[in-house]
């Protein structure tokens, strides 16, 4: 599902904090075209663990690619991190609320965050993730990430890895994968599981 050669060729932006992105990281084959339609119909906000929802085989395969050693090796090399003392926490999002997208950095328990968008198209000016230069201004961004099918961004979690998006309400499909320090994994998984019970 994932074209690892494309990922290897992506240029890392280190101007503020290390990240790289691609407009489409998927292989050029028919099974990838239907991923947006195969994505589970999530009608509430927040993050859903894959284990708590029924998934099509194509989405399972995609997650398997994301969590593969090949992907791990690429992330370690490109973002210059050591992931030997980490575990993966993967979640799905299918619906954006107006309150989502506020400027933030990710928690220090995370080493890397990867976001893969799975929307057939995106005809809105809002809802597109912005990699920001500071915590004050959503319009002062390094790069704006498309929310279309196959669009991906991965960044090293730092004290200044500010990101966010202009408020959007509606379907906004993505998979988020984090490499989390092992000592924090149980806390992350429990929080996502408890959250999913109330969706």
Model-predicted segments: where are they?
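Fe(II)/2-oxoglutarate oxygenase catalytic core
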Residues: 1-154, 158-199
